[in-house]
């Protein structure tokens, strides 16, 4: 299977998001890379499902709470930017204050 560098990046992010999702389901508090990966993967999947940029900006803030992450992680992530593929092309989605 031949993958472009962009496709490899998306696959790595999705895999990290799955790992974070499993750890969260087991009750573990997520660290910085896990939190970013989980939110980013969810935004990418939402774009694939046909949600709009505005919907994803709001949705991204509902994925994790301060109780889901280790101490201090929420403050380390002021925003997350994800290049997501929508039915009409690739767009940049910015989620401000993703962990509330």
From Swiss-Prot:
InterPro entries registered for this protein in UniProt: Urease_gamma, Urease_gamma/gamma-beta_su, Urease_gamma_sf, Urease_subunit
Subcellular localization(s) per the UniProt record: Cytoplasm
Q: Gene3D superfamilies, alphabetically?
A: Urease, gamma-like subunit (3.30.280.10)
Return the EC number: 3.5.1.5
User: Coiled coil where?
Assistant: none
Query: What pathway does this protein act in?
Result: Nitrogen metabolism; urea degradation; CO(2) and NH(3) from urea (urease route): step 1/1
Catalysed reactions, as listed in the record:
urea + 2 H2O + H(+) = hydrogencarbonate + 2 NH4(+)
UniProt KW keywords: Cytoplasm, Hydrolase
Molecular function GO terms recorded? nickel cation binding; urease activity
Example of a GO cellular component annotation carried by this entry: cytoplasm
| Gene Ontology biological process terms from the UniProt entry | urea catabolic process
What the entry lists under HAMAP family is as follows: Urease_gamma (MF_00739)
Q: How does it assemble?
A: Heterotrimer of UreA (gamma), UreB (beta) and UreC (alpha) subunits. Three heterotrimers associate to form the active enzyme.
Q: Which family does it belong to?
A: Belongs to the urease gamma subunit family.
UniProt-listed NCBIfam families? PRK13241.1 (NF009712), urease_gam (TIGR00193)
Identify this protein by name: Urease subunit gamma
Organism per entry: Albidiferax ferrireducens (strain ATCC BAA-621 / DSM 15236 / T118)
What does the record give as the organism's lineage? Answer: Bacteria, Pseudomonadati, Pseudomonadota, Betaproteobacteria, Burkholderiales
């Amino acid at each position: 299977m031949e993958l472009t560098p962009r496709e490899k990046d998306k696959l790595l992010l999705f895999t990290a998001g799955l790992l974070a999702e499993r750890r969260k389901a087991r009750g573990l508090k997520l660290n910085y890379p896990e939190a970013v990966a989980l939110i980013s993967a969810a935004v990418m999947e939402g774009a694939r499902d046909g949600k709009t940029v505005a919907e994803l900006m709001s949705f991204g803030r509902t994925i994790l709470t301060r109780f889901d992450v280790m101490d201090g992680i929420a403050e380390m992530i002021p925003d997350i930017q994800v290049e997501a593929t929508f039915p009409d092309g690739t767009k940049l989605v910015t989620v401000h204050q993703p962990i509330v």
